A protein has these predicted regions:
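Glycine-rich beta-alpha junction loops
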Residues: 39, 133-134, 210-215, 252, ...
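Flexible, small-/acidic-enriched active-site or ligand-binding loops
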Residues: 284, 352-401
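Oxidoreductase and adenylate-handling cofactor-binding alpha/beta cores
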Residues: 161, 183-203, 216-227, 269-276
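N-terminal helix-loop segment corresponding to the beta1-alpha1 unit
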Residues: 1-189, 193-199, 377, 383-409
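A glycine-rich dinucleotide-binding beta-alpha-beta segment and adjacent secondary-structure elements
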Residues: 318-372
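Flexible glycine/proline-enriched surface loops and loop-helix/loop-strand junctions
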Residues: 168-178, 249-253, 367-370
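Aromatic-enriched alpha-helical interface/lid elements that frame and gate functional surfaces
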Residues: 243-319, 323, 395
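Conserved Rossmann-fold dehydrogenase catalytic segment
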Residues: 135, 165-176, 198-214, 233-240, ...
């Protein structure tokens, strides 16, 4: 039994932030009904290549992007722009606990699928809206995309090498981190609202903004500015407040050292056979190492050119100083620790019984995550869900009219 068994989610979202939230809820046992456009589906279904191979190794038209964020969901293809399609959504909403949507602010009101409309049908509903900029403010009605928000929020100003270094300049993060974080925060907010409902008997509205989330997630960098009045700058792979905490080039390739305290730095110097560094008062305390970073780092950089990355990692790891390699994704998924933790899971797909995906990191002792089904084909569950309140004949008529899509019988 999943932790959220018995919770029904009407998922009107698409692309990443909303679907990421929905997938987490589904992994935890909620019934997540994903509404998609007939014959088209979620935009990310076409965000390929790469495409998922079928059982024989032939490429399907199921994108890797869609597969990463839609497992354990039920796909129902309904045209919500029509009155008949809206009526179908109302029927689902009547018994839903949660609604997730990420349309532009105000867009769903014209279809009477906004919070005001659905909460009249079901006052217990928890309704989560995810937008780029929130429901109010001067930019509320604008669409928001992860890349744009990474720039606006200040994240890109602290990501990448300084301008005066080769290859320097603002960089986005390698995954859509704002969307993913917003999905996580939305999941937390939804679960909080469900707990509140158990006390008050009422649902509520949740207003989530990508920009809000990423500004909140500036964490120490945002606080550093508020504390000092100085805007943090791009430092490549270095840390603004801890030294040494960065990548270093060995004889063959780069590796990472992350000394979080003075004892770890002392142990590092012992591990790499460089005790002379400890005789210099400039390097004993972290606050001084930060101040004299430009003296310490060149010394370490020169020293690390003497051996391979593996040799250094093994030596440093032996004294329990945080150290690591820089893996490709291929190497990361083959990492023994990742394999042991079962992060790559097999879920039979209708097109490929050997379908693999990256699983949930959540490990619950009593109500573990379960993988009931792979990401669905478009409209795969239309008949299964809508037959709860429509006959096969009625569904066939709706399909003929283009209101719904998917196999009916």
């Amino acid at each position: 039994m999943g932790a959220l068994q018995g919770i029904r989610v009407l998922d009107l979202s698409r692309v990443l932030a909303g679907p990421w939230c929905g997938q987490i809820l589904a992994d935890l046992g909620a019934e997540v009904i994903k509404i998609e456009r007939p014959r088209v589906g979620d935009d990310t279904r076409m965000w390929g290549p790469p495409w998922m191979p079928d059982q024989d190794g032939n490429m399907t038209r199921e994108s890797g992007y869609f597969q990463c964020t839609n497992r354990n969901k039920y796909s129902v293809a309904v045209d919500i722009t029509t009155s008949e399609g809206q009526a179908l959504i109302y029927e689902i909403a009547k018994t839903a606990d949660v609604v997730i949507e990420n349309y532009k602010t105000g867009s769903l009101a014209k279809y009477s699928l906004d919070y005001a409309s659905l909460s009249e049908l079901n006052p217990n509903i928890v309704y989560c809206s995810i937008t780029g900029f929130g429901q109010d403010g001067p930019r509320a009605e604008e669409p928001g995309y992860d890349f744009i928000i990474q720039g606006m929020s200040g994240l890109m100003s602290i990501t990448g090498e300084p301008d005066d270094v080769a290859g320097g300049g603002a960089q986005k993060v390698g995954v859509a981190v704002v969307d993913i974080q917003t999905g996580l925060y939305s999941t937390i907010a939804i679960q909080a609202a469900l707990i509140a409902r158990s006390h008050t008997g009422r649902g509520q509205y949740i207003d989530m903004s990508l920009l809000d989330v990423q500004v909140a997630a500036l964490a120490n960098q945002g606080m550093n500015y508020l504390a000092s009045g100085k805007a943090p700058q791009r430092m490549g792979n270095q840390h603004p407040s801890i030294v040494p905490y960065q990548t270093f080039k060995a004889k063959d390739k780069e590796f990472i050292i992350a000394c979080g305290n003075d004892k770890q730095f002392k142990d590092l110097c012992i591990a790499i056979d460089y005790p002379e560094l400890l005789e210099n008062e400039k390097f004993v305390r972290n606050q001084d190492r930060v101040k004299y970073r430009d003296e310490l780092i060149p010394l370490l950089s020169k020293h690390f050119l003497q051996k391979t990355a593996k040799e250094w990692v093994d030596m440093i790891h032996a004294l329990k100083v945080p150290v690591g390699v820089i893996n490709s994704i291929e190497d990361a998924l083959a990492e023994p620790q990742i394999v042991h933790r079962n992060l790559v899971v097999n879920i039979p797909h209708r097109l490929n019984e050997n379908f693999q995906t990256i699983g949930s990191p959540i490990k619950l002792s009593d109500t573990p995550v379960e993988y009931h089904h792979a990401p669905p084909e478009l409209g795969e569950h239309t008949a299964q869900i809508l037959s709860r309140f429509k006959t096969v004949e009625e569904l066939a008529t709706l399909k003929e009219k283009g209101i719904i899509d998917g196999k009916i019988a």
